[in-house]
Amino acid sequence: MSLLRNRLQDLPALCLCVLVLACIGACQSEAHEETPSPPPKLKMSHWSLVTGRMKELLEPVVNRTRDRWQWFWSPSTFRGFMQTYYDDHLRDLGPRTKAWLLKSKDSLLNKTHSLCPRIVCGDKDQG
């Protein structure tokens, strides 16, 4: 159950990564549309046939998805989403990180001290 809880905590970061990758992909695909295609004799290798077939299969899916999500790519919508994401997840990241580091340090010191032989470390109460 804790594994599922950890994955749910990572979901906002994963969504942000997917969103950024989608933005990059959309920008690159627009840049590739402007560049001319390579001459036909360079397309004769087996791997270029595979990549050509994959592009042929995936291009309609990518275009449909881009068309459906066009409203989201507008600057105001994207800026609003990023501001909301920052407010919800990243604004207090510094204090949360400091608290986590202190808690982890204390926990690690306690575990280390409990593993240390009494002759070397002494009693906990002696400090």
From Swiss-Prot:
Disulfide bonds: none annotated. It is found in: Secreted. GO terms for cellular component: high-density lipoprotein particle; very-low-density lipoprotein particle. It comes from the Eukaryota. InterPro entries: APOC4. GO terms for biological process: lipid transport; positive regulation of triglyceride storage; triglyceride homeostasis. It holds the Pfam family APOC4. Keywords: Glycoprotein, Lipid transport, Secreted, Signal, Transport. Its main location: secreted. Glycans are attached at N63. Residues 1-27 form the signal peptide. May participate in lipoprotein metabolism. Belongs to the apolipoprotein C4 family. This is Apolipoprotein C-IV. The lineage of its organism: Eukaryota, Metazoa, Chordata, Craniata, Vertebrata. The gene is APOC4.
